[in-house]
From Swiss-Prot:
This is YcgL domain-containing protein PP_4590. Pfam families: YcgL. Residues 3-87 form the YcgL domain. SUPFAM superfamilies: YcgL-like (SSF160191).
Amino acid sequence: MKRICSIYKSPRKNEMYLYVLKADGLERVPEGLLPFFGTPVHAFDLVLTPERKLAREDITKVLENLESQGYHLQMPPLEDEYIEHLPEELLRRNDPV
């Protein structure tokens, strides 16, 4: 199953993305989601296949969501994931002596 997908980024939340089928555009995205997401900003288009690897999403789940509901919402990583990647020096910078 090959799908051409448009990916939009959220102007409100860093690293939040909305995947939609390019042919459908945003018409299948629920109205209630857009106030939370903000006005979608087109990032890029991508051909999705079951064999394709995505950095932070399960391709099977993305394709299932596109078929069943017409969109897939990629949430930003948890704050803890950001903190784990900071150098120890930055994590201790404001520690009391």
